[in-house]
Each structure stands twice: as C-alpha cells, then as structure tokens.
Amino acid sequence: MIKFSDYMIILKGFNMKKYGLLLFLILSISCFSENKKFQQLQKDTVKGKITEEKSISEESTNEIYKDRMKNFIREIRNDAGKNKYIITQNGNELYFRDGKLDRNFFPVTDGTTQESLYYGDVLKYNAVTKKESKDYMLSLLNPVRKEGKPVFVINYAKGNEKKNFLLKEDAKTGFVSELLPEFEARAIYNPIQGFNSENITNLRQVKNYLLLLNPEKFSDINQYFEYLKNTDFDLLLIEPSHNGVFLTKSQVEQLKTKKNGGKRIVISYLSIGEAEDYRGYWKKEWSKKWPKWIVKENPDWKGNYIVKYWNSEWKNVIKEYREKLESIGVDGYLLDTVDSYYYFQEKMENGNKIPD
C-alpha cells in the first residue's frame, strides 16, 4: 500500500502547474482503489475456523439464507417463550441489514458471543487476532452492545498480561471476556473479573461466565454436576449431558445457586446449524445414508454436519431435542452454528446454489 508520504516525495520532482491535473487523477484513482481494498473480504471466526465475509458497507443484497436463519431463531423464541434466554454464538451479522441494525430481529435474542475477538486467531492458541479481523468483528459488536445487548467474548489464551489487557478492553467496550485454556471448551479456568456473591437475575448483571461444552474429563454426570455446583460463576454456558445422560431437573435447579449462595443463570448449548452424530437424536441409519437435509461434514469438526436448517424435518429434530432441555429446566439456550448460513450464501454467490 502506498502511503501519503510516498506521494509527497514524488510530488517534489513534478511541475505542479503542468502536471497537477494528472496527479489529481492518479491520487483519486489510488485512494478509490485503497478504499475498495479496505472494504474487501474480512475474516470472522466460525466455530473454530475462519470464514471470509464482506464488510457491512458491501453486504450482499441477497440475504435469503441469512433471513432463513433469523426466522429459525424467531421460531425457537416463539416456542420457548419470553422467559427463556437466547444467546447466539458468533454470526453477529445476523443483527444487521443493509449496514444498519435490524430492528425487527434485534429484540429476538438476549445476548451474543464472539470467539477469538482478541486471542485464538485461526485456531492458534495464544495467537493475537489479526487487526483487520478484530476491527471487523468490533464493527459488528460495538453497535450491538451500545444498544444494550450483552456481549460475551471467548478468547483462547493464557497469561496475566492478557487478562489485564482484556480487563481494560472490557472497561471500554462493556463486553464480558474470558480466557479459555483450550479450544475444545472442556477445561476449567478462573474468571478474569473474579467471583462475586451477587444475585444474577439477568444477563446484563453477568461479570463472569463458565463455558464448558465437553465434559468428557468427568467420570459421569454426577461428578460433572458436583463440580458445577461447587463453582461461583455468574453464568453457566454448558453442555447439560454426559455420554447421553442428562442432568436432572433437580440438579439444574441446584445449579442456579452459586456455591456462595448467590443466584445465577444456567444456559444449555444447542447447535441449530449443524447436526452432531454424538447427540441422542442421531439415528444409526444416518451414518450410512444422510437425510436429505444434511449437506456435508464440517471439515474442521468431525461428526458435525452442515444442515439445511430451514428444512422442516431438521426443525422437528431440534424441537424435540429442545423439549428435552425444557424438561430439565434450563434458563435458556446458547444457539451455536447460527453462522452456517455463510456456507449456503457463498455457494449461491459462486453460482452453485444448493437445492432446497
């Protein structure tokens, strides 16, 4: 990229009166070119992989797959009712239309998350996220937070220096950040802001959270429960089962109280843009022959399959699974893989639209 100072050096050797118009044209074309480059594809984290996306100002006018995901989330909201919390995982372009906040969709959810905003770039632990990626994600997250929606940032790194940096950034942005010790979200960690005994009755009060989505290190569901019960996190974003065995309603109710006695919120993980072959809803025959709504296996996550999330059969699968989660009394859902619409939109833009 040629800097303005470079142009000044060039100008010294020119007769401005004679070549002024020519130089004006050169500078105009160059500035236009650099501006276009700045608005080119930016990177956003999608369930551990990096996907290229256009900036808000150059958003595709065709938002069919984006709208289908929004409609799916609306349906989940309507079924779950207003008393359940809904938090989206990544995919924060969903909150925008034509470069502005989508006022029709914005109130549907109660919070959002963003992976690798500061650390954990391109599945590299401790790696600082590239400036262009970070700036793009912030261009989405800052307006969302300013409108009052809580933003929970998931970073993959360690070290006191990084913790102090995140504390300073959170003070400026209003986000709630954590440093996770690994990408699989199966390990225990201490929160950046420390614990408190306050009663947490809504997401805006949350000062720390535990993200634990793979409880495989625990021997069984009861050991998993005992660990969770003896923590003081304000918010639990968790997988509510272990090897197919779910927490009971009584156990979930107990988890809504911190070890120190304060009240807290318990949110269950729920992937709606990908099917997972380790879930109870997965049928053996699907491993031999995919249902028509499965498109492909996620190359970065074995056993996870991108689905046509607008398909009625898939929606019924999610509805039945969510009814199980309802029965154990969780406070709401962390909706993962909502960003799977990127895959379908990219296919369409490249002339390879996938049939419904």
Features from the language model and the residues they span:
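Sec-dependent N-terminal signal peptides
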Residues: Y19-L27
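Glycan-processing catalytic domains of CAZymes
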Residues: N35-D356
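Positively charged n-region of N-terminal signal peptides that target proteins for export
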Residues: I2, K12, M16-Y19
